From Swiss-Prot:
Pfam families: GTP1_OBG, MMR_HSR1. CDD domains: Obg. Monomer. Its EC number is 3.6.5.-. This is GTPase Obg. GO terms for biological process: ribosome biogenesis. It comes from Picosynechococcus sp. (strain ATCC 27264 / PCC 7002 / PR-6) (Agmenellum quadruplicatum).
Amino acid sequence: MQFIDHAEIEVIAGKGGDGIVAFRREKYVPAGGPAGGNGGWGGSVIFRAEENLQTLLDFRYARTFKAQDGERGGPNNCTGASGEDLIVDVPCGTVIYDRETDEEIGDLVFHGQIFCVAKGGKGGLGNKHFLSNKNRAPEYALPGLEGEIKQLRLELKLLAEVGIIGLPNAGKSTLISALSAARPKIGAYPFTTLIPNLGVVKRPTGDGTVFADIPGLIEGAHQGVGLGHEFLRHIERTKVLVHLVDLNAEDPIKNYETIQGELEAYGRGLPELPQIIALNKLDAGDHEFADFITEELRRLTDAKILTISAVSRTGLEQLLQEIWDVLDYLKEISRNEAPETSVMDLESLHIADE
């Protein structure tokens, strides 16, 4: 399936039904009286997070989403039926922006979480509403209000706890393949990976942790050079970064500094994320040189530094243990800081007529 992580769409909520002019004409009600009902609410457009969706591909083919209009009022003070809400499923991790203001208006993270992106119009008032002492037989009613129309931009930010970063050909895809059941395309040339790859790594407790191999980080990535600007946002939600450095590269220290510079330039919390530096390709490198690079890096960072080989799986157990330790520590300090969440009732999106 093609991986699409951004889309632009239009959403149109339903128009409220018109109120009507009607009068009672029963034989046993000689005085008659206004009896025109109100129009029903227009349907709203509601996004719902769905854990089984992994891409915004569907939004490349359907770009306009319209909810049902409300029905007009009926005689005998009958309110028209409300239009049916349009429920649109999106992947968990979808961020919703208003294209006209560039404002973030919604962020759907949890399965089943919903967000109303366009509210249906209120139904118009029937002539019964305008009955007064001065006007006993009003012959006018109000039309329903138009529903909201919005131009939206959708961005998918992957929900992975661990992000694997590094320059092209550092061995990121090989590492995620060695750690999980993911089978990304692997090759000995830059930009083999053109989309983020996800893999689930089992912990000793049996729980699964999602790892993401982020492609395309080169110098200037934060400005859109290479593929970086498209994919840097996918590590915004990660809790820890594994920074892979190729020991066989011409200048591993410079490569490390390049990626760190891109994280600093991009911002949005990425420089503050905990990091574990993994010096990769130890199987093809010089152990003394690896020790030298380790000491040089210790002058630049306080992050944990390990030497590994994704190909021979050397050092991977230690790497995983370091990752689990960081995640456990973060979980412990945030246990009492998690915000309360609640499930919104779809019916609560409509305000009752007063």
